Amino acid sequence: MFALAEDVATPTPRCTWKSAPMPCYRTTDGILLTIPLPAEEDAGTFTLTVERPGGRIVRQITVDDHAFGRELIFLTDSLYKRAASPREIARDARAVNSILSVESPERRWQGRWREPVPGMKSTGYGVERYYYRATDSTRSITLDTQAKPRGTFAGDTSDAPSPGAPSWRHAGIDLPARRGASIIAPAAGVVVDVGEYLLSGRTVLVDHGQGVVSAYFHLDTATVAKGDIVRAGDRVGRVGSTGLATGPHLHYGVYLHGKDVDPVAWRDMPQWMIQQRPDSAATDRR
């Protein structure tokens, strides 16, 4: 969710969302907030507060419930072994999550975000995915409609809707492409990780500043190194099928203040958001 408190001039912006501190930044038009609404966000009406000299702005924001759908995926034995390795998955998650939570104060990008690879998505954001062995495809499978998978490649699942089936929410979108196709940075940023992980395979993470990090999974090759500065349109890797992938494609994710959000919202962000310019007099978040 994008929010702007217009014409609010304060050297030390302070904002809260659901009674918890929320990073916010000065722009030439006011105070800008980008609030993560991951797929597992509770529905309801919540309070957004922006402190300002002489008082505060308080707004009630309603978050609607949404059904993201479910998907059953049948894997070869070797791929299923990856999905059923909670200890290794949790280890990788600890390493990756600390990077995804980076909150660098400078916004590095400008203009509309681009698509990292051309084409239509094959699986959308937030879909609940359940993983089975290929041999299970001939038997009847029952899902508990009241239970929900928790986590996004981030460790043990709880309340598993189907006993024995590893399950996660899809924390990004899948973009089918031929093996070796170029993957570009959708916006300017700095590469903060190039790694190899059990589920995401060859992975590149790019920090775009002010809590926004983009992720590229299952790469055949990475064409950048940690610390590289990239511009919008620069190549960061090539499409592959490393990690937990049944064929060549790019898993593309966007994380906001450490939480996954729908990448499509960043591609389709409103024009007023694109036009925001950081206040050069204040680049430090308070």
Task: Give residue ranges: language-model regions.
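Non-catalytic extracellular/periplasmic "stalk"
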Residues: M1-A160
